[in-house]
């Protein structure tokens, strides 16, 4: 609290008795006591501050002891001059922790106030001017930008160059043998290893952690290499299978091509212009598109007209009933093979005919005479054996 002292001057009244000069108050019967020296005030002038009386020489600043004549400031029972009061109880500098007089120019950084000479970098001691970049630390210290970046760089380098622990060959052998026994040893085992090797307990623990991480990483890399080799082999095998399909020649046997060369020729069993003679003629090979599962060769000729069916024996497996409609009423020539179906089974070709025409025929292909080619797509059709010899014996050759 600031209190301005009131200075009361009491002059002697002329013509008064001499005893009255001892009293500064006309109506006060007693002599006042000085608050500074605890003596009676017999001076001509009396000072009054804090509701107490003072000698003019006793009212002084508590810090600088300068006599106070016009104005003073007090805090508690002490009296101060203006400068000392603001130094002690006013705003303090964040750097030197001293009070700042209200008449002095200051600098501010956020909520902190500094003297002009205290507003400087703590590293290079350079006083910061208006416009300079600086960093305000947590303890209200100031660091210029150049020194701050340099300190950060040194700290990063010191962190990167942490001290390394050197393990001798004997210590490494002991740790390896313990790892082979148990990759994750208990605490008492680590303590025993620490005493045997002379290494710190923390060093032993970190060594086991790094060892387990290394083993896990090696296993993961090995698995990745195995899968990579597997996929490379698969890609290589696919490429070689495509080249093998392109290099297959017409006379070569495969899983999809079966040649019945050992069976008797059907041309020897029928007339020259019959169906069996036309089956022995060469025909263009029908194959699957490029990129399919395999190529299929048909060693049978096309059927040119319905006259050939009349020469077949009634009861023959190839017998087809005559068409009820006249040839003139039939639509235009229809393709005998309207669609090609390539199932994943051993069937190479499944043609289908138009309604009212000849029943669809099935070309069989297999791995040998004993193969069974009955599939779901052949439901409704009689399943013939793979070899024609097994059912040709039932045909009466005398009628041909």
Swiss-Prot record:
Transcription factor. Recognizes and binds to the consensus sequence motif 5'-AATTAATTA-3' in the regulatory elements of target genes, such as glycoprotein hormones alpha chain CGA and visual system homeobox CHX10, positively modulating transcription; transcription can be co-activated by LDB2. Synergistically enhances transcription from the prolactin promoter in cooperation with POU1F1/Pit-1. Required for the establishment of the specialized cells of the pituitary gland and the nervous system. Involved in the development of interneurons and motor neurons in cooperation with LDB1 and ISL1. Residues 368-380 have a biased composition (Polar residues). CDD domains: homeodomain, LIM1_Lhx3b, LIM2_Lhx3_Lhx4. It comes from Mus musculus (Mouse). The modification Phosphotyrosine is found at residue 230. Gene3D superfamilies: Cysteine Rich Protein, Homeodomain-like. Keywords: Activator, DNA-binding, Homeobox, LIM domain, Metal-binding, Nucleus, Phosphoprotein, Repeat, Transcription, Transcription regulation, Zinc. One of its GO terms (cellular component) is nucleoplasm. It comes from the Eukaryota. GO terms for biological process: apoptotic process; dorsal/ventral pattern formation; inner ear development; lung development; medial motor column neuron differentiation; motor neuron axon guidance; negative regulation of apoptotic process; pituitary gland development. This is LIM/homeobox protein Lhx3.
């Amino acid at each position: 609290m600031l209190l301005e002292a009131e200075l009361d001057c009491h002059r002697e009244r002329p013509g008064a008795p001499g005893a009255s000069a001892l009293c500064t108050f006309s109506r006060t019967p007693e002599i006042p006591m000085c608050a500074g020296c605890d003596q009676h005030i017999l001076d001509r002038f009396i000072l009054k501050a804090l509701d107490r009386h003072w000698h003019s020489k006793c009212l002084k600043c508590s810090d600088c002891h300068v006599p106070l004549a016009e104005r003073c400031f007090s805090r508690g029972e002490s009296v101060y001059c203006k400068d000392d009061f603001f130094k002690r109880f006013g705003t303090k500098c964040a750097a030197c922790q001293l009070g700042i007089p209200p008449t002095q120019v200051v600098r501010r950084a956020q909520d902190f106030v500094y003297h002009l000479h205290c507003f400087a970098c703590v590293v290079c001691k350079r006083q910061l001017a208006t416009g300079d970049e600086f960093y305000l630390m947590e303890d209200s210290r100031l660091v210029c930008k150049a020194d701050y970046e340099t300190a950060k760089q040194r700290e990063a380098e010191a962190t990167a160059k942490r001290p390394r622990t050197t393990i001798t060959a004997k210590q490494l052998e002991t740790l390896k043998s313990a790892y082979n026994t148990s990759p994750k040893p208990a605490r008492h085992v680590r303590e025993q290893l620490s005493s045997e090797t002379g290494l710190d307990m923390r060093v032993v623990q970190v060594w086991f952690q790094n060892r387990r991480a290394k083993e896990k990483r090696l296993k993961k890399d090995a698995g990745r290499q195995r899968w990579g080799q597997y996929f490379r082999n698969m890609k290589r095998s696919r490429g070689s299978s495509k080249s093998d399909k392109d290099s297959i020649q017409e006379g070569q046997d495969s899983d999809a091509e079966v040649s019945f060369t050992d069976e008797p020729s059907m041309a020897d069993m029928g007339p020259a212009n019959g169906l069996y003679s036309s089956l022995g003629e060469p025909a263009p090979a029908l194959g699957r598109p490029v990129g399919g599962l395999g190529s299929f060769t048909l060693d049978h000729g096309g059927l040119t007209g319905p006259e050939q069916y009349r020469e077949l024996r009634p009861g023959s497996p190839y017998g087809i009933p005559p068409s009820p409609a006249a040839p003139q009423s039939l639509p235009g020539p229809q393709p005998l093979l309207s669609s090609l179906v390539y199932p994943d089974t051993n069937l190479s070709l499944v043609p289908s005919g138009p309604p009212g025409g000849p029943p669809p025929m099935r070309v069989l292909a297999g791995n040998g005479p004993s193969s069974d080619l009955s599939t779901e797509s052949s439901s409704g059709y009689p399943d013939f054996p793979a070899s024609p010899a097994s059912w040709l014996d039932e045909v009466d050759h005398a009628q041909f």
